[in-house]
Amino acid sequence: MAQRIFTLILLLCSTSVFAGLFDAPGRSQFVPADQAFAFDFQQNQHDLNLTWQIKDGYYLYRKQIRITPEHAKIADVQLPQGVWHEDEFYGKSEIYRDRLTLPVTINQASAGATLTVTYQGCADAGFCYPPETKTVPLSEVVANNAAPQPVSVPQQEQPTAQLPFSALWALLIGIGIAFTPCVLPMYPLISGIVLGGKQRLSTARALLLTFIYVQGMALTYTALGLVVAAAGLQFQAALQHPYVLIGLAIVFTLLAMSMFGLFTLQLPSSLQTRLTLMSNRQQGGSPGGVFVMGAIAGLICSPCTTAPLSAILLYIAQSGNMWLGGGTLYLYALGMGLPLMLITVFGNRLLPKSGPWMEQVKTAFGFVILALPVFLLERVIGDVWGLRLWSALGVAFFGWAFITSLQAKRGWMRIVQIILLAAALVSVRPLQDWAFGATHTAQTQTHLNFTQIKTVDELNQALVEAKGKPVMLDLYADWCVACKEFEKYTFSDPQVQKALADTVLLQANVTANDAQDVALLKHLNVLGLPTILFFDGQGQEHPQARVTGFMDAETFSAHLRDRQP
């Protein structure tokens, strides 16, 4: 008897273990939205807390959270900063992971008042949910003058910079600016002023005074960075608008042109004169006077420093990150100050000889600044044209560097010239493809010929009109990143297109998420996107063939072969 019971238990365990072998290959491994983003709320008079418990491997979009009161008045809702998430099609977006708590202050609520909360999220594995809407019933709240102020929102992890350069680049840029013709010749004079004309100071004392001077200059730049970053944080949404991005790109281009010598960009001479007089009144050789001199020097922008400084300030405004803003400008000032400290301690013998090379350094920084408008315009014009702009910039830079290097007389420069010429030839490739139609030829194969449907009735009618042919239904939305990946990487593959040659292709665009879209998704029992359904010649779906989440071309082709009879 015991042996029979043991055998039965073993059989049951074996059944459960091997059951997974027979799971449908298209079966969704994703949980419903209510499990991925468990929503809850709690009200205590004027204070309402909205909470989301976010499942591991999932995230909510910050910009997709909307709160609308009905028969109630609430204070401005302050969404906490999230962490940056990047994808190929939407760039960088702020998201929330793990848990989100959102305090809402209710100033007044009538009986029966509600709060409509809309949010949307995705899974890391490439699966996005339609926007979810929850209705929060509110307890009656009487308005009074003592209503609490909006609750400060706990900050999540500060987002990192969303621009192409790290703050450490500012240190290198500062060092490079020190070798431009407007700055390098001034260092011996500045060194003498800082030391107060005293040539007998000890090395430690001279280094200390110079360090204090650099810190004064860094203080000014850091303050500028903090102010600009704070302003950028307030207008960060506006700074992402295409018109604003185009305007900033034009400004960056003008700044680069000033580095090329087309015009001079600096503070008005009257203001520069006043600042110089204020600096001259300070006593050199004393820590306090030297610090003030450095702080004032940070405001006196020469023609060589104005454009890079302006570019860095606009870069910081785009990031909206105060830590990044202050730190970037501090490192920039420190980079400019390092050569001054070395000259003060070791003397002018460390200075390289002046010459045309300093103008070339200035021109090189013009190309560095030109990289920023290309980065900004790439968000507006897309990847293809962005690649062409990067190509044009690369050809211009390496071509200029190659022509400049021809003036060199040293033998080893021949190797550098070969490298620069090769880099220019590599950079020009995207422009060649564009000019000779290679890109156009590739793009002619990128799209399947889908028939669009909107409602359940249209789907049923399309299944009838298929006349015995198999049908594939692709559920698509603009907010679904993986749907765009399917279009670009999977549906464009020749093997996939060949496998679908005898299949009727339907597509439902549910971007609007309106009543018809919701009804269609509910009818098909779809949790989120991307989801691809397959129907036989009789109009019956094959649930085991359903695809949820992204598949590359090879995997999807194998899936298509497996579903064939």
Swiss-Prot record:
This is Thiol:disulfide interchange protein DsbD. It catalyses: [protein]-dithiol + NAD(+) = [protein]-disulfide + NADH + H(+); [protein]-dithiol + NADP(+) = [protein]-disulfide + NADPH + H(+). Its main location: membrane. It comes from Escherichia coli (strain K12). GO terms for molecular function: electron transfer activity; protein-disulfide reductase [NAD(P)H] activity; protein-disulfide reductase activity. Pfam families: DsbD_N, DsbD_TM, Thioredoxin_2. Keywords: Cell inner membrane, Cell membrane, Cytochrome c-type biogenesis, Disulfide bond, Electron transport, Membrane, NAD, Oxidoreductase, Redox-active center, Signal, Transmembrane, Transmembrane helix, Transport. Required to facilitate the formation of correct disulfide bonds in some periplasmic proteins and for the assembly of the periplasmic c-type cytochromes. Acts by transferring electrons from cytoplasmic thioredoxin to the periplasm, thereby maintaining the active site of DsbC, DsbE and DsbG in a reduced state. This transfer involves a cascade of disulfide bond formation and reduction steps. Residues 1-19 form the signal peptide. Disulfide bonds join 122-128, 182-304, 480-483. Changing residue 480 to A: Loss of activity. The lineage of its organism: Bacteria, Pseudomonadati, Pseudomonadota, Gammaproteobacteria, Enterobacterales. Changing residue 182 to A: Loss of activity. PANTHER family: THIOL:DISULFIDE INTERCHANGE PROTEIN DSBD. One of its GO terms (biological process) is cell redox homeostasis. Residues 20-162, 229-242, 317-322, 378-383, 439-565 are periplasmic. It comes from the Bacteria. Changing residue 483 to A: Loss of activity. InterPro entries: Cyt_c_assmbl_TM_dom (IPR003834), DsbD_gamma (IPR035671), DsbDN (IPR028250), DsbDN_sf (IPR036929), Thiol_diS_interchange_DbsD (IPR022910), Thioredoxin-like_fold (IPR012336), Thioredoxin-like_sf (IPR036249), Thioredoxin_CS (IPR017937). Residues 434-565 form the Thioredoxin domain. It is found in: Cell inner membrane. Its EC number is 1.8.1.8. Residues 184-207, 264-295, 344-356, 405-417 are cytoplasmic. It is a multi-pass membrane protein. Belongs to the thioredoxin family. DsbD subfamily.
